[in-house]
Amino acid sequence: MPIVYYILPQVWAWKPWRAKSIEQNCDYLCGILPFELEMYKNALAQKRALYVGHPLLDEITEFKSEALPYKTAPIAFMPGSRKSEIKRIFPIFAEAAKSLPNRKILILPEHFKKLDSQALNEIYGDEIKAFDISFEANKALLESGFAFICSGTATLQATLIGTPLVLGYKTRGIEVLIARAFVKLKHIGLANILYNALYSNAPHSKMRDGTQQIHTELIQSQLTAENLLKAFEEIDIESFSTKAQELRDYLKHGSAKQVAGILNEILDKQ
């Protein structure tokens, strides 16, 4: 039975030598990031490496063709999914929120649904009382005019919906040193990584120059309530919306149908 690898490891970010082993041990490589297939040149030449679309576009069907009035519309807050990062980042987000009169939506990870109010208070602190709670990220982002987001895939999620954002991230110093030693990317937000790749045509060299970005990133000491509010006030809504549409066009479509088609074709040959 052929081996199909769907959602490839991030060899473009670190440990690129893994690509050769993956090529040798898998029959088909299904990438969800357009640029990452360049890491698998042999499989690409043999048409065994395919871009199948991004799974977020299977669930995100709506895009704001016109941005909401972000200074009066609700504002979404996504301070992460791990308790440790929430405890580092949410207090800073909450401090910035105090200066904003907008309705505030705190988006909680789905695995927190089983937690009672006391458990949530232990994680988020008393500041949680100033927020409306939502477990439906896509819905909350769609109705929000702006978002304060921790990092990672959530930045792409907001961008594909068309919600302007600022990324804020803070972690332990030792983790930063390790990341800088092994990961050479300029950005940490997936939306920025993808947008930079779109204009550099390389997954592991030019894309690291960081010359293109969709949203501001505030990392470590840069992450303050003052800087978050500054990013909020200075957002260029029109520019963001244009870039968000470009990124959506770059990713093209969801991946479910394409992967299912590949699997059906393989099974038909067995």
Segments the model singles out, each with a brief description of its role:
Residues M1-Q270:
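Nucleotide-activated sugar donor-binding and catalytic core shared by glycosyltransferases
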